[in-house]
Structures are given as structure tokens and as C-alpha cells.
């Protein structure tokens, strides 16, 4: 009996090993990892700049599509736009699932966000509502809030220019609340810190393989005080931030509505448009969730883009001078331009905004798609439930498409006559995601950066800091290495271009 049992176990092991070997031969190439269940490439996963490691692995294995298995989670990496387009765009119905993360969705409470909702009717309903209001056609209805935030940013920079980073974060947050809920935001409002905390947690938890609980969901039942359960303590703090980010502005808007003091906003307009004969609780839940999308985009990604714009102007003063020459030709020196002709009247500034989203790729790996059924691509098996990461950093730093990709060069998008060159790939598509899961806030984000850039360079020369002898100090163009990418902290000076504009803006 014992011999029979041992034989059966041995036969099972041999069968498992052979089946695994046969299946692995059908998968895309990738690093071998440790051939044990729930281990695989877990210890290969980079915690910093994973997009660089994935690109290097692609070169090592001579492929633009990689397979990894991190703790039982199957991962596909796409390193070229061709592969990304073939799968995420052309086969979008199969690749529109989303990461179902125990850490992010359950423990941190991000189930409200479109980026983490499972593909289905709820996702379609919420995305349809948000995308309609924030489409390219409708985005101008929010321009007053964008201009107001840009002008207020200038006033804050005149008073305390050394706090420029905090001022950007505050004004982008204030704009988001104005658009989403029609409410004001004090400079020291705790909502800002809560939003920043929630977004920082999301950035850390979104790195592939960053928390074991995503591979072993049963770990979520561990007591938070237990050694090794630090992830639960982190999740608790991050969830408090996310809950405050979602609920505070919505409840404030509702109170103002009852008092008759609410200003027009996305949320108030949606509430007024609710079907009185429908499920009111459900309709309000959809409005609450979609209004939060304005905060999520403004709370981190737009702040990163505006900060990168300032960094680029400091590092590339010749670009700054050319933008200012374009602005001055449209109006006069020190006069903030009319924003009705965003793309046509200031093509070089528009090219700068395109280059910002390429040069400072905010989400280098985007948010992963999940395959809803087995697929075959180029003869490779792409397994059901695999997480599919598009390496946008690789796409936007492709030297064949963007020569000298580490350099900030807006002119790459313009022809010799200074007009947009349609033959150059617009980087904003890759910067804002792919297929049915692309970011519906793209038009709000890019117009916010455009207006902020035009306003800042109309009023200021943005210059390098100086040492004790008045000599300019060079600053490096360095960026964070987490899932969401930002410029590392740096110093700069905001020097008013004319006394007249200084008096005008201050007044």
C-alpha cells in the first residue's frame, strides 16, 4: 500500500512537472524564476523603476512580450506599441478586465474608482456618465475653474514663491473641488493631506508584487498587530485617506444644496438630472463615485504634470523663451492670453504640453488590464486572468519615434513652418492609457496643464536658483521611481516679467 501511494504521488509530481513544462513552452518568454507554486518570479520583481527592468528583459529575451509569474499571479508585459495596439486596442473586449487587488480594492477601499472596477455594467454606466461630461466637446464648461486656479496660483507664487510645490498641489485640488462639487478649499484644509495620503498609498500598492496579500488573499485575516501584518496597518491609514477624499466634498456639496448655497458643478448638475422614478440610491452612488474621479486625476497626476512643466522650463530656458515669444506675439508682454483658441493660436505651447506627457511619463506602466479569457498571440498563449501591463515608458522613449528621448524637445511635434506635424505620433495617447480602459479625464488634464503653462509664462520668468554669490545653480532632471512618476523636489525662482503685470495680478 505504501509503495502504491508513493508511486501515485511520484506519478502526480511527474505529471505536474510535464504539464507545467508543456504549458510554459506555449507562454511568452521571460526570466525562469523559481519553479515552485506561488513563488515563480516573486523575487525577480523590481520595486523601483520596474519599466526599465521589463524593457531590459525584453532585450535579453529578444521579444516585446514577456511572461512572469509573481506569487501565482500571471503577468504579461508589452514593450512596444504594436503589441499594445494588437491586444489592448484591437482585442479590447477581451483585455478590459481590471486588477482585482486584495490590497487596493478591499483593504484600501478603492473599489469606488473607475480604474479598479471590474469590466461590466457598473463600469460602463459610470464611465459613460463621466466621459460624456468631460469629453473634448464639453470640457470648456469648466474653463472658468481652470483659469481661476491658474490666476490664484500666480498670486500665491508672488507672495511665497519658495512654497511653489505646495501651491500647485493646493490649486489643482481647489480646481478639482470647484469643478466636481462647486466648493472652495482652504489652503490648510485636511482634505488635501488626505487625498495626497490616499494617492501615495495607491502608488505604493500598485507596484507588481509589492504586497504578499495580493498573492495570498487569506493574509487579509491576520490581526494587524501581528509581526508581518504591517500591510494591514498601512492599508488602514490609506483607507482613511481615501474615505475622506470621497465623502467630505460630496457631503459638503449636499449640505450647501439644501441651504440653497451650492454653486454649479458636475455633482450638483448630475443630482438635478436624476430620474425621480428610478433607483435614487443607486443614481446617487454613481454620482458620488464619478465625482471622485475629478479628485483622483487632479490630486496626483495633474500636479505631477504641472511640476514637470516648471522643471522643463528651468532646465531648458531656450524653450521657455520661445513659449514666451509666442505668448507675447499673441497679446503683449506680461498679458495673460485669451484661452478660446487653445491649440491653434499657440502651437509651440501645445507642443510643450505634448512633450511634458512624454518626458514625464506619469504612469510608466499604466494600470494593468486583465484578460477575461485565454487568448493566443503570435503563437503564444496569453492565459485567462493574466494581468497585462503596457510599458508606456518604453513606448514614449522609443528612439526610433522620438530621437534623443531623454531630452525635452517640443519642436519634435512641429514642421519647419512651426505648425503641428501630423506624421509624429502624439504621445498623449500612450500617456493616458489604451483601449476601453484609457483615462476619460485626458481632456481636463491636458487643458489644465496648457492653461497653467500659459499663465505662468505670461507672468514669470522661471529661473534656476542661485548660490550665495548670485551664481545660478544647475538642477538635475530626476524623477521618482514608484508606480506613479513625479519630478524629485527641486528649487527654482519665479521672477515677474514686468512690474505692470505684477501690479495687475496682485490687484
UniProtKB/Swiss-Prot annotation:
Record region (Disordered): 403-425
Summary of the protein's practical applications: The pharmaceutical interesting psilocybin as a treatment option against depression and anxiety is being investigated in advanced clinical trials.
InterPro entries per the UniProt record, alphabetical: Cyt_P450 (IPR001128), Cyt_P450_CS (IPR017972), Cyt_P450_E_grp-I (IPR002401), Cyt_P450_sf (IPR036396), Cytochrome_P450_fung (IPR050364)
GO biological process: psilocybin biosynthetic process
Catalytic activity: tryptamine + AH2 + O2 = 4-hydroxytryptamine + A + H2O
Cysteine disulfide links: none
Residue sites binding heme per the record: 439
Pfam family, one: p450
Start-end of Basic and acidic residues biased regions: 408-425
PROSITE patterns in the record: CYTOCHROME_P450
The entry's keywords: Heme, Iron, Metal-binding, Monooxygenase, Oxidoreductase, Signal
Signal peptide: 1-19
Source organism superkingdom: Eukaryota
GO molecular function: heme binding; iron ion binding; oxidoreductase activity, acting on paired donors, with incorporation or reduction of molecular oxygen; tryptamine 4-monooxygenase activity
Enzyme Commission designation: 1.14.99.59
Required cofactor(s): heme
Keyword Oxidoreductase recorded: yes
The protein's annotated pathway: Secondary metabolite biosynthesis
Summary of the function given for this chain in its UniProt record: Tryptamine 4-monooxygenase; part of the gene cluster that mediates the biosynthesis of psilocybin, a psychotropic tryptamine-derived natural product. The first step in the pathway is the decarboxylation of L-tryptophan to tryptamine by the decarboxylase psiD. PsiD does not decarboxylate phenylalanine, tyrosine, or 5-hydroxy- L -tryptophan (5-HTP). 4-hydroxy-L-tryptophan is accepted as substrate by psiD as well. The cytochrome P450 monooxygenase psiH then converts tryptamine to 4-hydroxytryptamine.
UniProt family annotation: Belongs to the cytochrome P450 family.
Name of the protein in its database record: Tryptamine 4-monooxygenase
Natural source organism: Psilocybe cyanescens
Gene: psiH
